[in-house]
Every structure is written in structure tokens, then in C-alpha cells.
Regions:
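Prokaryotic Sec-type signal peptides and long signal-anchor helices
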Residues: 17-20, 187
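N-terminal secretory signal peptides that target proteins for export/translocation
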Residues: 1-17
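A short, highly charged, low-complexity intrinsically disordered segment
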Residues: 12, 142, 243-247
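Low-complexity, intrinsically disordered terminal/linker segments enriched in charged
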Residues: 161-247
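Core segments of small alpha/beta cavity-forming domains
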Residues: 36-114
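Bacterial N-terminal signal peptides
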Residues: 19-30
Length: 247
């Protein structure tokens, strides 16, 4: 099954919405950069390598290409890339725990942390590349264009593992905080194993809009856009746990 950007899943599952927002918000400070003379596809490949795979070399390559446009300064904070994963993890854990009853949070911290760590590991293994782009005039900036770049990725396929996990846990009616806590602890612990054991191969597609010209180069102020379809594919099951637990 090919996955593309879809907002309906976000609207359905409040836990997924909170977790997804935590992932993308962590990218704003690190990636609110401007760009120079690369093609739209080359620019996107470097964004993908930097923000999906955490590749510091890609960030440095991006800066080398952009430096002439920025008076010799770096466009991306390369020093922040190695710690970006820690920031994301902390934000995601905090977002998930904030949705839990206060008395359950201590018991859920460890299984939630384990599932997020496994998620980050498989995210970094994703294989992505730009596949093409189209351009149109930017009606808000005279003389500039918007390049919509298509990209494709291969990610781990978590759906079979999630299906098996849900069958194992069943569909209990969770009428007390204790029951809900036990269910969620089992689910998040199970999700860590699902991520660890999931095979690579699920296709995912997405798009990102870049702004600029072929002469000046291209940039985005929203590097999290390259992560959106991968987040949907890999974190959607965590959101579905919220739906089950709310029953």
C-alpha cells in the first residue's frame, strides 16, 4: 500500500495528532533556513538526508551549497542535528504522557519511551529520494517560483505487526484508569517490538514546496514537510491505540 499525506488520520486520533505535532515542531528551529544554488530535487534530497536520516554530512553539504547566498554563513545549524533526535524524543514522550491520566504517567513513561526510541531507529533507516518537480509562479513574490517536489521513501512495514499485537491484546472495555494504564503499557511495549522487527519495504510518497528560482536556488521554511508522510506511516498505529484506550 502506498501512503501519501492524509489529514484524516490526524483528525481521528488525538494521541497521533499530539505525537505528530511534537515531531514536526522540533524541526522548526533547526530547519528554518534559506537556500541557494541547488536544483529543487537536490535541495529536497539534502533535506531528506538531514531531517529523516539525521545525516550531518548532508547538512554540511547543504550549507556548502547555500553559503554564497548567505554571505559565507551557514544556513542550517549543523551542531543541532545530532541532538535533534533527543529533542524530538522528549517532545513526543511529553505529548503522549500529557494525554494520560496523571496517576498513570509514571507507569507509562518507560513503555512509551521504548516505543519512541524504536520508532526513531526505524525512521532513520528510511530510504528516500526526490523523484521530480514542477514549478509555477509565486503570486506573492514577483520573479520567484514555487517548486513542488515529489519524493518517495521505503520505510518499515508495521501494519502486520500492529495487527498481530491488537489481536493479542484484544478489544477490552477499559472502564478504569488501572485497566487503561495496563492496556496502554502493553501496547507501547508491544509497539517497540513491532518497530524493531518490522521488515523494510513499505512505499511512501510525499511532496514538499520549495521557494526560489533556478538561478538563486530553493528553500523551505518548513522542513518538517518531508517527514509528514513517514510520520503518518510509522506513528499512525500509536494514534490508533489512543482510539482503543478511549473506549
Amino acid at each position: 500500500m502506498t501512503v501519501s499525506l492524509h489529514a484524516r488520520r490526524v483528525a481521528r486520533f488525538p494521541l497521533f495528532r499530539a505525537t505528530r505535532a511534537a515531531v514536526l515542531s522540533a524541526l522548526v528551529a533547526a530547519g528554518a533556513a534559506h537556500a541557494a544554488v541547488l536544483t529543487p530535487e537536490q535541495t529536497t534530497d539534502l533535506y531528506l538526508g538531514t531531517f529523516v536520516n539525521g545525516d550531518v554530512a548532508k547538512a554540511a553539504q547543504f550549507n556548502d551549497a547555500m553559503r554564497p547566498r548567505f554571505d559565507g554563513k551557514d544556513a542550517l545549524d549543523v551542531a543541532a542535528i545530532p541532538t535533534l533526535g533527543d529533542t524530538m524524543r522528549d517532545n513526543m514522550i511529553a505529548a503522549l504522557l500529557s494525554k494520560m491520566p496523571a496517576k498513570s504517567r509514571a507507569a507509562l513513561r518507560a513503555p512509551i519511551s521504548a516505543s519512541i526510541a524504536s520508532y526513531q531507529h526505524v525512521l532513520a533507516r528510511s530510504e528516500c529520494r526526490a523523484t521530480g518537480s514542477t514549478q509555477k509562479p509565486n503570486e506573492y513574490v514577483e520573479g520567484e517560483s514555487i517548486a513542488t517536489v515529489d519524493f518517495s521513501c521505503r520505510v518499515v512495514d508495521v501494519e502486520p505487526g500492529v495487527k498481530a499485537l491488537k489481536e493479542k491484546l484484544g478489544n477490552p472495555r477499559l472502564k478504569t484508569d488501572k485497566a487503561r494504564t495496563a492496556f496502554l503499557a502493553a501496547f507501547f511495549s508491544g509497539m517497540a517490538h513491532v518497530y524493531d522487527e518490522a521488515p523494510m519495504g513499505r512505499p511512501v510518497t510525499g511532496q514538499v514546496d520549495l521557494y526560489g528560482t533556478n538561478e538563486k536556488g530553493w528553500l523551505t521554511g518548513s522542513p518538517g514537510d518531508v517527514l509528514s508522510p513517514l510520520v503518518d506511516a510509522l506513528l499512525g498505529p500509536i494514534g490508533s491505540a489512543g482510539g482503543e484506550a478511549d473506549k
